[in-house]
């Protein structure tokens, strides 16, 4: 889906001696850094006009629209430039949730002296826990409490949600900050289990939260 109208003072952007400016691309919902690419004035102009990311390929010496062959288009939500006007930050909706040509979500998936490939770090703990919950759903483990909830089914999960909600209320009534934090964490966890059970992604929840930012 195309982004809303974008604007940027092109004449204020400071390009290097090659006419390029680095562009950091970030997921607009959870903040994950997806990639670093390069733009020139023309690619930036096309990005503003089309609402999708266009970059300059230094190896091929040509413009390229992200997702041209893979279909993993990036719809731009916002473009910012830094205090020196020589770097860009784009927040995007990443189609297919894959930004890297290797098939990884983020291009920043390598770590260590040997550059071994690892799972890119999630942007927040909630995402990390949700990913683990989904793994326990899809690949059950005998000794896993999370897996046992999925095995027990929806009624068990909903019962736990009700119990945890009541415990949050009681902790708040007691005005116990430490207990409140602990009980809310339990509630968040069981809510994530319910989301995973019903195949609702955190992205869908984030989108609804965006509508409530008033």
UniProtKB/Swiss-Prot annotation:
Q: Identify the GO cellular component terms for this protein.
A: cytoplasm
Keywords, A to Z? Amino-acid biosynthesis, ATP-binding, Cytoplasm, Histidine biosynthesis, Hydrolase, Multifunctional enzyme, Nucleotide-binding
* Annotated spans, Phosphoribosyl-AMP cyclohydrolase: 1-125
Q: Where is this region: Phosphoribosyl-ATP pyrophosphohydrolase?
A: 126-214
Which top-rank group of organisms is this from? Bacteria
Name a GO molecular-function annotation.
Answer: phosphoribosyl-AMP cyclohydrolase activity
Cite the annotated pathway: Amino-acid biosynthesis; L-histidine biosynthesis; L-histidine from 5-phospho-alpha-D-ribose 1-diphosphate: step 2/9; Amino-acid biosynthesis; L-histidine biosynthesis; L-histidine from 5-phospho-alpha-D-ribose 1-diphosphate: step 3/9
> What EC numbers are recorded for this enzyme?
3.5.4.19, 3.6.1.31
Q: Which family does it belong to?
A: In the N-terminal section; belongs to the PRA-CH family. In the C-terminal section; belongs to the PRA-PH family.
The name under which this protein is listed is Histidine biosynthesis bifunctional protein HisIE
What gene is behind this protein?
A: hisI
């Amino acid at each position: 889906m195309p982004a809303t109208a974008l604007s940027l003072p092109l004449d204020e952007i400071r390009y290097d001696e090659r006419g390029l400016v680095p562009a950091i691309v970030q997921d607009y919902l959870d903040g994950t850094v997806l990639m670093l690419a390069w733009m020139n004035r023309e690619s930036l102009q096309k990005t503003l006009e089309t609402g999708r990311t266009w970059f300059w390929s230094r190896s091929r010496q040509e413009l390229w629209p992200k997702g041209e062959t893979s279909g993993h288009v990036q719809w731009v939500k916002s473009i910012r430039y830094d205090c020196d006007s020589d770097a860009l930050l784009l927040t995007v909706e990443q189609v297919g949730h894959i930004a890297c040509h290797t098939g990884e979500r983020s291009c920043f998936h390598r770590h260590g002296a040997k550059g071994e490939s690892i799972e890119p770090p999630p942007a927040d703990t909630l995402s990390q826990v949700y990913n683990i919950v989904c793994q326990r759903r899809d690949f059950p483990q005998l000794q896993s409490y999370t897996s046992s909830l999925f095995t027990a089914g929806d009624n068990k999960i909903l019962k736990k949600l009700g119990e945890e909600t009541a415990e949050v209320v009681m902790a708040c009534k007691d005005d116990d900050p430490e207990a409140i934090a602990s009980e809310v964490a339990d509630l968040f966890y069981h809510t994530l289990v319910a989301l995973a059970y019903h195949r609702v992604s955190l992205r869908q929840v984030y989108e609804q939260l965006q509508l409530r930012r008033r």
